[in-house]
């Protein structure tokens, strides 16, 4: 708000990374923090001149960034609801999830939405239960599955008491999850509208979908802000920390995690996908694993290499080509 207000008034604005001003605070013995001291420290940073400015992104980038971050929070809310649904099912019908490859398949959720509890499933007409299964699975599942589910409901060793309370909770949680699913769909459409305004080819990188590409672009903004791929790696906070003193040099360095958490999360998700995708990055992951690296360490290495690929694609503004970038 302050930036927008001052910009509208015609002031020249410099945005300074708060890490730089906060580092100056650590020089003082007393770690007091208030508005007056914060203003003084910012003035000191400017007086010493040892700072770099951060440029603000254009309006479309900022709008897309807001939507992507909001989507991330909605996804987190949906994940929490799924965990609560899963917990309730473990209590009242622990055998149910084993009937499907995933509890969240449309067939599974269709049955849950209709019956909610194992008692209701057990008492449901078999033909009615089968119709739901047939419809939701697009005729892939047979009557045998309906019989199997009803038998499991009859023989469950889940909690038998307070079924009404569990049923009420499930109904509310499923309704909320469905509502969030619709919100995510609407958000995806809005995000893609913004993404398509840019001449961006991040989605051509194997393992990076359209929404992931939009998230990464929104967090990076103008690629010209970064002098090299190493600078982008540092901005994402996936650069290793350096621990050296005299002749000692640490061999177990962790990621700095000092950059954008949203960018880091998006890159790591993409790196995880790339690690198992038929691509040069998959070969790189296997190479690290063959060297005895832990899965997370190998994925971190893939994330850094992927960030270099992202940098090249944005810098050159052209689609991903394995021979060019890897």
Segments from the language model and where they lie:
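A detector of single, family-specific signature residues
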Residues: 1-326
């Amino acid at each position: 708000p302050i930036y927008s207000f001052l910009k509208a008034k015609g002031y020249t604005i410099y945005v300074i990374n708060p890490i730089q001003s906060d580092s100056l605070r650590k020089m003082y013995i007393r770690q007091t923090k208030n508005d007056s001291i914060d203003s003084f420290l910012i003035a000191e940073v400017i007086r010493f001149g040892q700072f770099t400015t951060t440029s603000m992104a254009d309006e479309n980038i900022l709008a897309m960034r807001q939507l992507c971050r909001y989507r991330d929070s909605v996804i987190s809310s949906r994940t929490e609801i799924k965990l609560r649904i899963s917990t309730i099912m473990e209590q009242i019908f622990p055998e149910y999830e084993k009937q499907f490859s995933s509890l969240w398949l449309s067939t599974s959720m269709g049955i849950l939405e209709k019956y909610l509890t194992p008692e209701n499933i057990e008492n449901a007409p078999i033909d009615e239960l089968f119709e739901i299964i047939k419809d939701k699975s697009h005729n892939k599942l047979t009557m045998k599955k309906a019989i199997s589910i009803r038998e499991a409901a009859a023989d469950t060793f889940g909690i038998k008491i307070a079924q009404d309370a569990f049923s009420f909770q499930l109904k509310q949680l499923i309704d909320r999850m469905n509502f969030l699913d619709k919100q995510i769909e609407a958000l995806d459409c809005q995000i893609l509208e913004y993404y398509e305004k840019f001449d961006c080819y991040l989605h051509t990188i194997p393992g990076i979908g359209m929404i992931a590409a939009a998230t990464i672009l929104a967090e990076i903004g103008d690629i010209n802000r970064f002098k090299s791929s190493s600078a982008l790696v540092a901005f994402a906070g996936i650069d290793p920390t350096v621990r050296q003193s005299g002749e000692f040099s640490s061999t177990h360095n962790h990621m700095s995690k000092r950059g954008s958490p949203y960018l880091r999360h998006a890159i790591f998700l993409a790196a995880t996908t790339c690690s198992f995708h038929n691509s040069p990055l998959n070969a790189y992951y296997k190479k690290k694993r063959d060297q005895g690296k832990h899965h997370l360490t190998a994925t971190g290495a893939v994330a850094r290499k992927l960030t270099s690929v992202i940098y090249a694609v944005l810098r050159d503004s052209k689609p991903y080509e394995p021979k060019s970038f890897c």
